[in-house]
Amino acid sequence: MSGGLDILSLKEDDITKMLVATTHLGSENVNFQMEQYVYKRRADGVNILNLGKTWEKLQLAARAIVAIDNPSDIFVISSRPIGQRAVLKFAKYTDTTPIAGRFTPGAFTNQIQPAFREPRLLVVTDPNTDHQPIMEASYVNIPVIAFTNTDSPLRYIDIAIPCNNKSAHSIGLMWWLLAREVLRLRGTISRSVEWPVVVDLFFYRDPEEAEKEEAAAKELLPPPKIEEAVDHPVEETTNWADEVAAETVGGVEDWNEDTVKTSWGSDGQF
């Protein structure tokens, strides 16, 4: 798929990321349509995926996404919790439309409901859990890209990207690689420069574990410093209240005394 170009070939750093995230580990069961992507079978029954074919299908999916003129017409879907954060991050960096969580039945086929949408392309995390949007897409001729495991059904799927879609780290890494490849094909980022967005942002985080980590981080923080109270010298002040009270008592007139009556008449009578 790379056409012999070294710039499009799978790099050693990307291979290391895939191996660490267990992207190459499939399940014990194999769908007959997924046999072409299986490299070999381990002694414990786990099937190993061919990462070279995974990379080729990833590039094909990225080219299909870039071919859509309006990115908002591309819907990225994940019903499983481990892929919801990755879907939201992918939509943020590629300007696509995310559906994280439960898919509303009839969103692609029932025109009278408020949630009706007409996407041009779907990208789903797991064909097993996201079977409802895949089925509705087949009714209205919407192409579908899916991350598939060795036991995933490929019915109504146009581009299958073989990977371990049951691991939180693996599915987060695959969404990150797909987002990076889309941005490279659009010309947003260069292939010679490392994408500054770390892959950890696409990984699923359990809310309970996140709360525990925050609580542990707070315990490691040093206790706040309490400043000691400083006694400031108090200047001696004169009690002005006594002097004011003395002057007031001496200067008050007796308003109860009889006033001198003045006669306004000429004879001095009232």
UniProtKB/Swiss-Prot annotation:
Q: GO CC terms on record? A: cytosolic ribosome; cytosolic small ribosomal subunit; nucleus; ribosome
Look up keyword Zinc and say if it applies. no
List localization entries: Cytoplasm; Nucleus
Cite the record's Polar residues compositional bias ranges: 261-270
Q: Name one GO molecular function term.
A: ribosome binding
State any GO BP term from the record.
Answer: cytoplasmic translation
Question: InterPro entries of this UniProt entry?
Answer: Ribosomal_uS2 (IPR001865), Ribosomal_uS2_C (IPR032281), Ribosomal_uS2_CS (IPR018130), Ribosomal_uS2_euk (IPR027498), Ribosomal_uS2_euk/arc (IPR005707), Ribosomal_uS2_flav_dom_sf (IPR023591)
Identify the domain of life: Eukaryota
Does the keyword Phosphoprotein feature in the UniProt annotation? no
> Residue ranges of region Disordered?
251-270
* PROSITE patterns with a match to the protein in the record: RIBOSOMAL_S2_1, RIBOSOMAL_S2_2
**What keywords would UniProt list here?**
Cytoplasm, Developmental protein, Nucleus, Ribonucleoprotein, Ribosomal protein
* SUPFAM superfamilies xrefs: Ribosomal protein S2
Xref: Pfam families? 40S_SA_C (PF16122), Ribosomal_S2 (PF00318)
**Predominant localisation class:** cytoplasm
Q: What does this protein do?
A: Required for the assembly and/or stability of the 40S ribosomal subunit. Required for the processing of the 20S rRNA-precursor to mature 18S rRNA in a late step of the maturation of 40S ribosomal subunits. Required during oogenesis and imaginal development.
Give the record's subunit note.
Component of the small ribosomal subunit. Mature ribosomes consist of a small (40S) and a large (60S) subunit. The 40S subunit contains about 33 different proteins and 1 molecule of RNA (18S). The 60S subunit contains about 49 different proteins and 3 molecules of RNA (28S, 5.8S and 5S). Interacts with oho23B/rpS21.
PANTHER family found in the cross-reference section: 40S RIBOSOMAL PROTEIN SA
Entry's family note: Belongs to the universal ribosomal protein uS2 family.
Name of the molecule in the record: Small ribosomal subunit protein uS2
